[in-house]
Amino acid sequence: MKSLWMLSASFFFSLMAVFVKMGAEDFGTFELIFYRSLAGVILLYTFIRSRGYTIRTPYLFGHFKRSFIGTVSMSIWFLSLTMLPVGTSMTLNYTSPLFLSSFMVVILLMRKQPMPWGLLSCIVLGFCGVVLVLQPSFSSGQMLGAMLALASGFLGSVAYWQIKELGQLKEPSWRIVFYFTVFGTFYGLLGNLFLEGGLSPITLDNIGYLIGMAVCATCAQCSLTLAFGQGNVLLSSCLQFSAIIMAELMGLFFFGDALSLTTEIGIAVIMVSGVCATMLTRRQQTKP
């Protein structure tokens, strides 16, 4: 099942976050977006030329929508991180699977098709696991940050839906990611020049962080695009929660972050929801 590529995406996104955290002391946010995207352009264009593929597409506007919405979603999430505790911001950002489920429910109701209550329940269960792991908290004066994080989750779901539409148009995953990285390159560079005062020096001490971040980001985006573009949207949404598990494990192994009992219970809940969603989807696909 193509949706299982989401597990690969979650792993690489979590590993990318490790490199971002290590390089954050030397580079600004827009600068990291620029280097991450630029390396993706170089890697993917090299792959495209070596295989004799083409970047020409009749769906250029669709690629622009996916890239623009996805980049805006990422940007306002970064902004929400400056206004909210990390756990709260991430929890609200991970409402995107809930929004995707809502889109699917509306479409199925309009088409008068049967509702996949089992998968929808797994997504809700997985989100409950995310809440247990991240343990969000609010205080007065954080409404703007909460709205931004929630908007990021909504826009993220719209971007994922756009990936699904491009996949249905037979656009290959590498082309979808290529245009996303091209957009991110210009966006990151302009943001850096106007808001961060220019690029920081690259040294032997920090270049490894950039390379690791760029390779992981490219692999993660390709995997995510395969999952949403060619897989089951609801299953991919549910498996997206696995990124929370992998991020916690990365924090444990690389930074010595301790796991509380509540976190461990939340991880177990996310794992159960993912396994159940996979089994339900496989059973549905094997029905005559």
PLM features per residue range, with description:
Residues 115-135, 262-281:
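Hydrophobic transmembrane alpha-helices of multi-pass small-molecule transport proteins
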Residues 97-119, 245-264:
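C-terminal transmembrane-helix exit sites in multi-pass transporters
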Residues 239-288:
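C-terminal-most transmembrane helix of multi-pass membrane proteins
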Residues 1-9, 49-78, 144-152, 192, ...:
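Loop-to-transmembrane-helix transition segments
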Residues 89-95, 170-183, 218-253:
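Helix-helix packing/entry segments at the starts of transmembrane helices
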Residues 41-59, 128-140, 184-206, 277:
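Membrane-interface helix-cap regions at the ends of transmembrane helices
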Residues 18, 44, 137-196:
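Transmembrane alpha-helical segments that form core, pore/gating elements
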Residues 23, 32, 36, 80, ...:
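Hydrophobic/aromatic residues within transmembrane alpha-helices
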